[in-house]
């Protein structure tokens, strides 16, 4: 494989791969805003348009624009969120697969993102990697963060792009080869973070929004006293608490998808800064030397 990463390090560039508009705001947005403020170029690739999303904000139920054109509404929301975060943004152009429900589960809709052959689904992302030339790619884990079919496919295309964009024999016609240096999985739903916030809230005499989630994790643990061990441990924590309000504003920009009185806003930004001022990641592969644990996704590159 040909590698260009050592040929050009400045400016540093990061690419985050997400399934739907709004995912970038709920997973890693404070980290991205922090890096943007320090001069890093940050790009978000959104695999689908979120056309099959439901309205999650009670205040917008029955909104005629969203009901008539959910895809159009979410494009406007994504543009607003990108502006708030200061990031660059690229749609990859696939159709939302929706979240199947029922027993048995219904078939996914024809031609949706999750049913695309991998080489077709990954090609636009490989093209973007070769054009944007990121040093770091941030992706979901094998479970997609949670098992939505589009999240699982977003994981697959991100890993495929990381492994093939530097090979000029792969994906011909998508631009000159570029080999990213590091691949991370996002750990937005880190049980350690939820536990720390939960107990801090209890100690302060405040209601915790994490009680049910923690109870569910405890039920799945064979020992019954600690959360299940993650397949991908935290290797890297980014101190970005100063950007939690920016994160929250980006979330609110996705008005159809986010309840402003809901789970994401149940704990104040100052409390989160005090207890857990980081966003958490797991280093999956590095083509540059680095030492764990890290406090910088670009460790080994500067």
Can you name each region flagged by the protein language model?
Residues 1-133, 160, 282-285, 290:
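Active-site rim/loop-helix segments in enzyme catalytic domains that contact anionic ligands
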Residues 1-15, 102-106, 110-302:
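Metal-dependent de-N-acetylase/amidase catalytic core
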């Amino acid at each position: 494989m040909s590698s260009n990463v050592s040929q050009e390090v400045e400016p540093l560039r990061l690419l985050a791969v997400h399934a739907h508009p709004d995912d970038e705001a709920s997973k890693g947005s404070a980290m991205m805003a922090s890096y943007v403020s320090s001069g890093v170029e940050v790009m978000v690739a959104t695999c689908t348009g979120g056309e099959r999303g439901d309205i999650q904000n009670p205040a917008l139920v029955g909104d005629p624009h969203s009901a008539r054109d959910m895809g159009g509404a979410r494009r406007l929301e994504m543009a607003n969120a990108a502006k708030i975060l200061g990031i660059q943004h690229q749609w990859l152009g696939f159709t939302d697969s929706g979240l199947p429900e029922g027993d048995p589960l219904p078939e996914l809709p024809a031609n949706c993102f999750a049913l695309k052959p991998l080489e077709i689904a990954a090609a636009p992302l490989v093209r973007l990697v070769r054009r944007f030339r990121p040093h770091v790619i941030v992706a979901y884990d094998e479970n997609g963060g949670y098992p939505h079919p589009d999240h699982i496919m977003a994981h697959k295309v991100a890993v495929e792009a990381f492994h093939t964009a530097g090979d000029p024999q792969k994906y011909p016609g998508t631009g000159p080869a570029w080999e990213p240096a590091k691949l991370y999985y996002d750990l937005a739903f880190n049980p350690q973070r939820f536990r720390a916030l939960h107990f801090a809230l209890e100690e302060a005499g405040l209601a915790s929004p994490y009680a049910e989630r923690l109870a569910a994790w405890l039920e799945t643990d064979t020992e019954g006293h600690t959360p299940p061990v993650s397949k991908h441990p935290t290797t890297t924590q980014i101190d970005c608490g100063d950007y939690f309000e920016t994160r929250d504003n980006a979330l609110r920009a996705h008005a159809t998808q986010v309840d402003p009185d809901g789970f994401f806003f149940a704990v104040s930004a100052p409390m989160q800064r005090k207890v857990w001022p980081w966003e958490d990641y797991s280093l999956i592969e590095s083509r540059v030397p680095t030492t764990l644990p890290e406090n910088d996704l670009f460790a080994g590159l500067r």
